[in-house]
Design a protein with these regions (language model features):
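Catalytic cores of DNA base-excision repair glycosylases
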Residues: 2-201
Length: 201
C-alpha cells in the first residue's frame, strides 16, 4: 500500500485544524464529495471558531443544507465553536480527551483530526477500514474500537502515521463492499477473504 501511495492524503478539503475538525464532523453519514461541495463557500468566510460564531447557526445551515442531518450538525458545530472559544483559546486541542469534549466529536472524528492536523499515529475506523480489517482478517473485531486497538498492536511503528489512510483508501477504491476488485488488489496474496477467488472475472 505504501508503494502505491507513499504520502496518502484524506479527501476532505480544509485549510487549518479548525476547518478540518468542522469538515470531519460534517462528514458523518455523508460523502466527502458532498461535504467538500458544502464547505467550499463556508470556508471562504469561516476559518476560526470565532468566525463560526459570528456567522451563526442559521447562516451555517444555509451553507450545509445539502448534507444529511444538517440541522443537528449545525447545532453541534456552533456549540463546539463556543467551547473552543471559551475553554481552549479558540484553538483545536491536540489530545483525544479534550477533542471528545466538543459537541459532535466522537473518537473517530478526534482520531482523524489528531492524525491529519497534528500528525499523530492514530487510527480512525470508518466503515471502509472496519470492512477491510474484518474481511482480510488483519484485525477482526465486532466494534470499531476493537478493530482500532488490534490495528494499533499489529501495525509496525514506521507505518503507523499513514496506516489509517492507506486502509481507508484501499477500502474505498479496491476492497469495496459489494464488488471488491480482488484481481487488482496489491495485497491479494496476503488477504484471507474466502470469497475473493469467486470474484476473479
Amino acid at each position: 500500500l505504501e508503494e502505491r501511495e507513499p504520502e496518502p492524503k484524506g479527501e476532505l478539503d480544509y485549510t487549518n485544524p479548525y476547518t478540518l475538525l468542522v469538515a470531519v464532523a460534517l462528514s458523518a453519514q455523508a460523502t466527502d464529495i458532498g461535504v467538500n461541495r458544502a464547505t467550499k463557500g463556508l470556508f471562504k468566510v469561516v476559518a476560526t471558531p470565532q468566525e463560526m460564531l459570528n456567522l451563526g447557526e442559521d447562516k451555517l445551515k444555509q451553507h450545509i443544507k445539502t448534507i444529511g442531518l444538517f440541522n443537528t450538525k449545525a447545532k453541534n458545530v456552533i456549540k463546539a465553536a463556543q467551547m473552543l472559544v471559551d475553554n481552549f483559546d479558540g484553538l483545536v486541542p491536540k489530545n483525544r480527551e479534550d477533542l471528545e469534549k466538543l459537541n459532535g466529536v466522537g473518537r473517530k472524528t478526534a482520531n482523524v483530526v489528531l492524525n491529519m492536523a497534528f500528525r499523530q499515529p492514530t487510527i480512525a475506523v470508518d466503515t471502509h477500514l472496519f470492512r477491510v480489517s474484518n474481511r482480510t482478517k488483519m484485525a477482526p473485531g465486532k466494534t470499531p474500537l476493537a478493530v482500532e486497538l488490534k490495528l494499533e498492536k499489529k501495525i509496525p511503528k514506521e507505518f503507523s502515521l499513514h496506516a489509517h489512510h492507506w486502509l481507508i483508501l484501499h477500502g474505498r477504491y479496491i476492497c469495496k463492499a459489494r464488488k471488491p476488485s480482488c484481481p487488482i488488489c496489491p495485497v491479494n496474496d496476503l488477504c484471507q477473504f474466502k470469497g475473493k477467488t469467486k470474484l476473479h472475472n
